[in-house]
Amino acid sequence: LARHAEIRQSQLNSLWGWALVAQVSFMLIGYPWYSGNILFAFAVTGQVLRWVSQPSWYYTLPAAGLLVAWIPLSTASYGMAGVGMLTASWLLCRAQHAQERLGYGVLWALMVLLMNMHDVSESVAGLAIALLTLMVCSSAGERVKRFWPRQFFVMFYAVHLAVLGIVVSM
């Protein structure tokens, strides 16, 4: 979503659709129906960012309402720290100046640590893996063309949950 000047509602609609498709499989592997899968975390964050970036205050209340509604549903998807990390990622991708990048980078790192705050070693490992991935991808990313097709992540996520659901039911 950060590649474009603004978040497109058509992209979000597709993401909401895949989140619904994946939710069925998410329930099959044992999560309660009210626990949203990670695609919902992406969709909620993207929708809120789209609404608050509109020039009118008209969308502020729905954005706040969506965030509040997501809180009890987000326990299986990194909670509000996940939303904070995704928001910090979006802001970091849009940063124009070094001070902005530094500030949003620190915020992003804190959010990654908070996503696994129940275990310090998991928090540090999560941050280390994320930073290593960023370093590798940023140094090789300009030379490598897109490997997977568009929408691969959301399709793969939904299909892998379905496969896990089938395995669990055997």
Predicted segments, located by residue:
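Alpha-helical transmembrane segments and their immediate juxtamembrane cytosolic regions
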Residues: 1-170
